[in-house]
């Protein structure tokens, strides 16, 4: 008998701006998607194509997020756990078991769960969740780039690159920036002085 298993992964823990995303995915018993692996090992074009195939073939999937305010009030780890719980809670079908990428399990899932280090390279459901979380996170960065093109979010995806730090210096901190992350916090403190 096939056990309904969900894979859960996150995207966007390290950037200085935007939400942290998590996805939960339940795949059918027979599922083969050549090239599906950890989203970080895939080109953007391949990720986007795989994301559509995953959404079309999954038994259930859900993407959720925790925003910059939640990251600031909870810290990035707890905000990530919150996004993961939201992703699981949003599934239209309740899984019997959950595999979560990493070494921590969100509280109050009420479903048997197991943390799997490097699970996005080992368990296909986690690989699928990795792709959905990353494509959702990238979509947020493209939308932010449309509103604030001078920051280059479409290129660096919110990470603390030289280009991003220079834009922060020149244009200041946006409401979407994570004010508790050191480079942003330091600039925000400087701006508050003037």
Swiss-Prot record:
Residues 3-193 form the RNase H type-2 domain. PROSITE patterns: RNASE_H_2. A divalent metal cation binds at residues 9-10, 101. The keyword Lipid biosynthesis does not apply. This is Ribonuclease HII. It catalyses: Endonucleolytic cleavage to 5'-phosphomonoester. Its main location: cytoplasm. Endonuclease that specifically degrades the RNA of RNA-DNA hybrids. Its cofactor is Mn(2+); Mg(2+). Manganese or magnesium. Binds 1 divalent metal ion per monomer in the absence of substrate. May bind a second metal ion after substrate binding. GO terms for cellular component: cytoplasm; ribonuclease H2 complex. It comes from the Bacteria. The keyword Metal-binding applies. Belongs to the RNase HII family. InterPro entries: RNase_HII, RNase_HII/HIII, RNase_HII/HIII_dom, RNaseH-like_sf, RNaseH_sf. Its EC number is 3.1.26.4. One of its GO terms (molecular function) is RNA binding. Gene3D superfamilies: Ribonuclease H-like superfamily/Ribonuclease H. It is an enzyme of class 3 (hydrolase). One of its GO terms (biological process) is DNA replication, removal of RNA primer. It is found in: Cytoplasm. Keywords: Cytoplasm, Endonuclease, Hydrolase, Manganese, Metal-binding, Nuclease.
